[in-house]
């Protein structure tokens, strides 16, 4: 639903001041636009340069003036130009027509694929769902990825922080999650690129096309909509593009009643843009120079990401930690909203263990017996204890060798190595690179497999049989094949 226009819609004001991306606009007495209304400035400036800018009202200054933040470059704006009050908030297209397309903060397509064929639009500002509309029973969101489902399960309608440096497999993990939710849950995904590199957005788009997540021949069969506000754009666009992506996701949840994945890369840039806008508006900075409204800004976005009785939005958010300081107000405020953290480790990627999810550093509030059940909880904790013991023994092994360990410790090391290998699995979206067919592993199969390793049932199988397979039956089949090849 498009936002209802207010009584001031169509009122024209005059630009009185331009400071970077911030404009002061004077309106007739009694005709001031509401805060968060979109202003539209179109036409030619005195030099004959075409100007088409949308700005969002942020402050009412007095003397019939408002202060607005532009969503694009203010090059060419001059004092005296007219600004039209649209009478409503910025609205973006929603629904199936957005799938396979790339949008900017204003919902305009930027992929050179022509206009979007839909009349359905929705305002980017709306209240979070009422308490009575929320699904309060915690439900595990099965991803089909063993290491996540067992050790750091995602909550349906929850928020997950994704931590990882360059080249450890963040994008591939994101693609696999998009693929799995489409195939197994019949859901769709929305990707919000907030203040990251344009090159990365382009690479992601090309990789989505290559892996089939975006179907170039028939866009309606695509599984993802993309919304970008990149590093080179003004802070207004970077501050609002996360809300544009979220609005598209909310439509799939509330109207189509689907389970939706919302990716935000990077949530820190959203806070950073808010800080820039806050300074431009003349607000007194808070701790470490952040905006005084930091908690409110983050909360307004995060509280809309939730499970309702109709459907769910599960959010995966890449979190940049400035100077690796977890006490910095930006990541610290974000952490308060997260249900799970998935940490990607370079050391695992170097060993060829993909996905390179760190089984000891990744956490989830869902991993408790009352939510996942006793068997899942016991298996997960037992696996983590074995891996932790292996980590402690590595120094001894490096200095003295395996032979100096006790019988029990040798058994622990053997099982830990099998667990480490079994936590890897081939991905559907990586088939073209690995030549191996992707695997979706049900949670029950994952738990059963790790229980068999921990019980010692599979102690006789070679370590390599556990590498890049799906469930435990594939391990046994691979071990038999290896044995027959060794004989032959």
Swiss-Prot record:
SMART domains, per database record: AAA
Catalytic activity: ATP + H2O + 4 H(+)(in) = ADP + phosphate + 5 H(+)(out)
InterPro entries membership: AAA+_ATPase, ATP-synt_VA_C, ATP_synth_F1_bsu, ATPase_a/bsu_AS, ATPase_alpha/beta_chains, ATPase_F1/V1/A1_a/bsu_N, ATPase_F1/V1/A1_a/bsu_N_sf, ATPase_F1/V1/A1_a/bsu_nucl-bd
Nucleus keyword on record: no
Membrane topology according to the record: Peripheral membrane protein
EC number of this enzyme: 7.1.2.2
Keyword annotations: ATP synthesis, ATP-binding, CF(1), Hydrogen ion transport, Ion transport, Membrane, Nucleotide-binding, Thylakoid, Translocase, Transport
Protein name: ATP synthase subunit beta
Lineage, top ranks: Bacteria, Bacillati, Cyanobacteriota, Cyanophyceae, Synechococcales
């Amino acid at each position: 639903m498009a936002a209802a226009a207010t009584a001031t819609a169509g009122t024209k004001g005059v630009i009185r001041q331009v400071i970077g991306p911030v404009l002061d606009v004077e309106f007739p007495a009694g005709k001031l636009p509401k805060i968060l209304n979109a202003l539209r400035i179109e036409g030619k400036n005195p030099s004959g340069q075409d100007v088409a800018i949308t700005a969002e009202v942020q402050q009412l200054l007095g003397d019939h003036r408002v202060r607005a933040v532009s969503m694009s470059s203010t090059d060419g704006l001059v004092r005296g130009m007219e600004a039209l009050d649209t009478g409503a908030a910025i609205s973006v297209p929603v629904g199936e027509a957005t799938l396979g397309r790339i949008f900017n903060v204003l919902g305009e397509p930027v992929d050179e694929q022509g206009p979007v064929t839909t009349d359905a639009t929705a305002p980017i500002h709306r209240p979070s769902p009422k308490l009575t509309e929320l699904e309060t029973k915690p439900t595990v969101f099965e991803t089909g990825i063993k290491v996540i489902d067992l050790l750091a399960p995602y909550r349906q309608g929850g928020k997950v922080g994704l931590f990882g440096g360059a080249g450890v497999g963040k994008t591939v993990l994101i693609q696999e999650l998009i693929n799995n939710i489409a195939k197994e849950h019949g859901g769709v995904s929305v990707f919000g690129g907030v203040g990251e590199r344009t090159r990365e957005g382009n690479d992601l788009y090309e990789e989505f096309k290559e892996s089939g997540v975006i179907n170039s021949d028939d866009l309606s069969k695509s599984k993802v909509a993309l919304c970008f506000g990149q590093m080179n754009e003004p802070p207004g666009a970077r501050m609002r593009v996360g809300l544009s992506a979220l609005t598209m996701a909310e439509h799939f949840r509330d109207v189509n009643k689907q389970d939706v994945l919302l990716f935000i890369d990077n949530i820190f840039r959203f806070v950073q843009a808010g800080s820039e806008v806050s300074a431009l508006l003349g607000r007194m900075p808070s701790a470490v120079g952040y905006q005084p409204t930091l908690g409110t800004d983050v909360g307004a976005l995060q509280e809309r990401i939730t499970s309702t009785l109709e459907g769910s939005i599960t959010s995966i958010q890449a979190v940049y930690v400035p100077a690796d300081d977890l006490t910095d107000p930006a990541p610290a405020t974000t952490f308060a909203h997260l249900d799970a953290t998935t940490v990607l480790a370079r050391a695992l990627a170097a060993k060829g263990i993909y996905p390179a999810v760190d089984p000891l550093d990744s956490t989830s509030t869902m991993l408790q017996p009352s939510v996942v059940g006793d068997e899942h909880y016991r298996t997960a904790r037992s696996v983590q204890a074995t891996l932790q013991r292996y980590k402690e023994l590595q120094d001894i092994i490096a200095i003295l060798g395996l032979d100096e360990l006790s019988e029990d410790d040798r058994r622990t090391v053997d099982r830990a190595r099998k667990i480490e290998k079994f936590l890897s699995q081939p991905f559907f979206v990586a088939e073209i690179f690995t030549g191996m067919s992707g695997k979706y592993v049900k949670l029950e199969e994952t738990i059963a497999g790790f229980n068999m390793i921990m019980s010692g049932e599979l102690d006789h199988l070679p370590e390599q049989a556990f590498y890049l397979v799906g469930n435990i039956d594939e391990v046994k089949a691979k071990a038999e094949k290896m044995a027959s090849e060794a004989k032959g």
